[in-house]
Amino acid sequence: MARMTDASPYLDFDRDTWRALRKSMPQVLTANEVEKLRGIGDRIDLTEVAEVYLPLSRLIHMQVEARQKLTAATEAFLGNPPTHVPFVIGVAGSVAVGKSTTARLLQVLLERWESHPKVDLVTTDGFLYPTAYLKEHGLMQRKGYPESYDRRALMRFVTDVKSGKPLVTAPLYSHVSYDIVPGEFQEVRQPDILILEGLNVLQTGPTLMVSDLFDFSVYVDARVDDIEKWYIDRFLKLRHTAFREPGAHFASFADMTDEEAYVQAREIWQSINLPNLIENILPTRVRASLVLRKGSHHLVDRVRMRKL
């Protein structure tokens, strides 16, 4: 049974209790598919998919179907023809915590259900201001903070998707050049489900925010010390991959020694990523519909689900 207290807005599940909620849902991914979805440093395997993500997929599927029925009932009451309203999911969490892998897994799992086969995934990276703008406004050291995003454009994008526009576009971002890709866009054409993944998607404010348009949200959580270690480990590995690609923004880091790279990564973490986590990202955790809590092994060991 889930642990529940009147004082908490959440139901708490240990891993054994949560995995039982998979019920009879079959495994729909292969080891090769999981390998392709896994991010650098992640340890997700078929067992993690079966015990954590299949139950989550089942929960979201049930909520999508319930929302579809509610929308149909409302339109019938109003005497309107059926309308297509995408179900919007937000996925939030710190850099290096594994939220991108979580979002990719959810996309693949959710599109296997017959009632919502079209699932689009968009990251908020595309709504960062271009590097030239960030430099001009002194925001390069604040990249990833709320003010470094074009929040109006992001809000307009989600609103347009939610309202059922036939075609909506999102800018593309390159992690190699560390900048927006000029003239390139991701097309979103009336999906059944839209997954929006990013650091600050659960932010609130005095006016309408994208989080107000979410039907469900996931926060990927872990101890700060563990996230720091994962960030540094990932940085060290990137010296041999992305940092060596043509046009890489961080090419100067590629030939650093382990000691030099460790010092550089820790400085970036301490000066940029950690303050952003503490000031902006972590405070939004309480708004999530569900929290996936990872242990030091980078695998989920607890799940917290908001009471409905």
From Swiss-Prot:
Catalytically driven reaction(s): (R)-pantothenate + ATP = (R)-4'-phosphopantothenate + ADP + H(+)
Principal localisation: cytoplasm
EC code: 2.7.1.33
Cellular component, GO, one term: cytoplasm
Positions annotated to bind ATP: G93, S94, V95, A96, V97, G98, K99, S100
Keywords carried by this UniProt record: ATP-binding, Coenzyme A biosynthesis, Cytoplasm, Kinase, Nucleotide-binding, Transferase
An MF annotation (GO) of this entry: pantothenate kinase activity
Biological-process GO terms, alphabetical: coenzyme A biosynthetic process
Superkingdom per UniProt: Bacteria
Compartment annotation: Cytoplasm
Functional pathway: Cofactor biosynthesis; coenzyme A biosynthesis; CoA from (R)-pantothenate: step 1/5
UniProt record similarity statement: Belongs to the prokaryotic pantothenate kinase family.
Entries under NCBIfam families matching the protein: panK_bact (TIGR00554)
Protein name: Pantothenate kinase
Provenance organism: Corynebacterium aurimucosum (strain ATCC 700975 / DSM 44827 / CIP 107346 / CN-1)
Gene: coaA
